[in-house]
């Protein structure tokens, strides 16, 4: 995994955790949790690709990995839409920058997961 991606995830999560969005802070905490979950999932897929022999063990261990993959793409799409929505409604420049970086990172991670999944199929 690219060290820039790791630092990007950590930076965005740290920035998001500092935001106070009033009544929507529960939603923000949910976004942070999903970001963390997405990072772990992407990392595990990347590791499976690195050990291509693990493809069969991945499939045997989890016969529903394609279903999980589909679910992760749905989560990514939801996060992208949520981040875009937040970006449109916020007027705070710190939050705008954070959400723009989060959006860029989500698009990069979506592409990485697609690449990993095609290698595993």
Swiss-Prot record:
GO terms for biological process: exit of virus from host cell nucleus through nuclear pore. InterPro entries: Flu_NS2. GO terms for cellular component: host cell nucleus; virion component. The keyword Signal does not apply. It is found in: Virion; Host nucleus. Keywords: Host nucleus, Host-virus interaction, Transport, Virion. It comes from the Viruses. A motif (Nuclear export signal) lies at residues 12-21, 85-94. It holds the Pfam family Flu_NS2. The keyword Nucleotide-binding does not apply. Mediates the nuclear export of encapsidated genomic RNAs (ribonucleoproteins, RNPs). Acts as an adapter between viral RNPs complexes and the nuclear export machinery of the cell. Possesses no intrinsic RNA-binding activity, but includes a C-terminal M1-binding domain. This domain is believed to allow recognition of RNPs bound to the protein M1. Belongs to the influenza viruses NEP family. This is Nuclear export protein. It comes from Influenza A virus (strain A/Turkey/Ontario/7732/1966 H5N9). The lineage of its organism: Viruses, Riboviria, Orthornavirae, Negarnaviricota, Polyploviricotina.
């Amino acid at each position: 995994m690219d060290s820039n991606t790791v630092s990007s995830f950590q930076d965005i999560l740290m920035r998001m955790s500092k935001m106070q969005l009033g009544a929507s802070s529960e939603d923000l905490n949910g976004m942070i949790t999903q970001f963390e979950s997405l990072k772990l999932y992407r990392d595990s897929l990347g590791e499976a690709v690195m050990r291509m022999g693990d493809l069969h063990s991945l499939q045997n261990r989890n016969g529903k990995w394609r279903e999980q993959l589909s679910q992760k793409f749905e989560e990514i799409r939801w996060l992208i839409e949520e981040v875009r929505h937040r970006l449109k409604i916020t007027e705070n420049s710190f939050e705008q920058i954070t959400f723009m970086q989060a959006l860029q990172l989500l698009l990069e991670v979506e592409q990485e997961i697609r690449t990993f999944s095609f290698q595993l199929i």
